[in-house]
Amino acid sequence: TLVSGDNNQALAIGGITNGVTNLELTNAYATIANHGEYHTPIFYTQVIDHNGNVILDNTETMETGREVLKDTTAWLLTNAMQDVLTSPEGTGGSANPGNTPVAAKTGTTNDDRDTLMVGYSPYYTVGFWGGNDDNAIIRSTSFSNRVWKQVMYRLHEGLERKNFTKPEGIVQAVVCKKSGKLAIPDVCNAD
């Protein structure tokens, strides 16, 4: 439940008074990755032994999703979060696995007690939280980016490179940096 003090930037990474679990936060990002379609989260789909035999099968519990975001809204969020990993100004450049398109959000609490990296590709959504059980200050906050990068890299080894799909209804245009209006060639370029 949100309270009035929860209206801040930390909301995007679960920084609310009563908190969210890593599973809930990761599932929120999975909903964006699924074009705005929400599915109740499950921890695993199958457990397979070293011989390739399915020991546990959780695929029957997977439900049909329901739309909670427009696909266009989900794509705009994805497009913005791709900059976190690809833009020189982005805070997650060191987390880009390089072998798949990704969108993500980094996060660190003001007092360096928690670090977070949550994001997705067209295939997988991964959330990573790092901190101490006793809420002590952590020595480094960049390790969440490194762990997330390695997990995403390994998950995508051998997979066909797939881009995020832009839905119908998205209109792209060049905007003049000075006026904020549509750019006019030779009058106001997008610089």
What are these regions, as identified by a protein language model?
Residues T1-T26:
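Mid-domain, small-residue-enriched loop/turn segments at the edges of structured enzyme/sensor domains
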Residues N18-D191:
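A penicillin-recognizing enzyme superfamily signal
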